Amino acid sequence: MILGTRDIIEQIQRGNVPDGYKKTKAGILPADWDVHMLGECLSRVERPVEVKPNELYTQIGIRSHGKGIFYKEPVTGAALGNKSVFWIEPDCFIVNIVFAWEQAIGKTTQSEVGMIGSHRFPMYRPVNDRVDIDYLISYFLTKRGTDILEAASPGGAGRNKTLGQERFLKSKIVLPPIEEQKKIAAILTTQDRVIELKEKRLAEKQRQKKYLMQQLLTGKKRLPGFSGEWKANRLRNIATRHTKRNTIGNTNVLTISAQYGLINQAEFFNKAVASDDKSNYFLLEKGDFAYNKSYSNGYPFGAIKRLTRYEVGIVSPLYICFRIKEGSVSGEYLEQYFEAGLMSHEIQAFAQEGARNHGLLNIAIDDFFNSKILLPSLEEQTAIAEVLSAADREIELLRQDIEQEKQKKKALMQLLLTGIVRVKI
């Protein structure tokens, strides 16, 4: 009887051994899969560099989470000093022993020949065609593989948690026949390329939107049908400070995220981190704005976000909150204006350089509300916001598509690297 994927999964979950499988210490595996020590499959490769002071050398680095190799700026041998470095050999498994527990692994190629790597980046070449490097990298990104890297990296977090190479090579790994390894690796590599192409498309859409923002929100480019004068308005003329406290016991605690805006804190951090007493928090309604005065990536002078996800929520009293005056400005336009960073130069002008309290910019409320904002007519604001919102929707759909492709890859890894689904050779 030929079993389907669901039948195999159900049998394995019940502890039964399906036809064509066997029970091992590593779990239930296909009958032709074996368990090997890594030392039986890999051999260390090293060729020391005789560093010459006047020569230029390009060093590699290894990103965490299986993101692979990157190149550093060339340096002279004199700048390397007494560092112990090695020539990069092609077609090897390479690992950063300091961050192996974070899956800082990769595969060397012909592109890296002539470059050098730290003594902390040991390289290994397959022995007797027992293991495919691409398969091995995918394996180390699974739960079973990361467990091996962590177990071989004892100690505390950070630089004290270093991979013990002897322990690493004594670790046991599950391997299908080499041809099946290569086929599995090819399938996963194809899926990686799908993700990579869509991520490039997303980056291009984001660049296009940024260009549109810079053109439309400054009046450099006008939409058809609009030619009216733009005027500078102070924030206090179009919005009022919002300080309503949470007297109703609302528990939807919000935080500001660069990508998601005002989002539920527990959802964003996967845990509740706010204090128990939330009565002094500000109570926001949909459409209200909040300004986080702390620096974050991409927001050197803090981020201003609009509440769009929920009807109501609460934020820390450290935020500056405000509500637009009805009929004075488009909330959607203002949201795009702040996202473009066009308020930053205003904040920079009155924020004291280096004056931060617990990471927060020292900003006076009056100064903040005296900030100037360039505004066209309400009709043109609405039209601009519609164009930029349409671009946002395209970007969000692409993000969702990419996330689905990543989930698809996870499912493929779970099925292919455990032998639940077999590939045809």
Pin down the residues of each PLM region.
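A short glycine-rich beta-alpha junction/loop motif
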Residues: 18-22, 101, 115-120, 155-179, ...
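A short beta-sheet element
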Residues: 84-145, 164, 282-343, 356-357, ...
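DNA target-recognition patches
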Residues: 18, 39-43, 47-81, 123, ...
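Non-catalytic DNA-recognition/assembly elements of restriction-modification systems
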Residues: 19-49, 170, 178, 223-246
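Residue-level recognition of short, solvent-exposed, well-ordered loop/turn junctions
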Residues: 34, 71, 77, 83, ...
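Short, solvent-exposed loop/turn positions at domain surfaces
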Residues: 23, 79-82, 157, 190, ...
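Amphipathic alpha-helical coiled-coil/heptad-repeat segments
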Residues: 1-28, 32, 175-231, 374-425
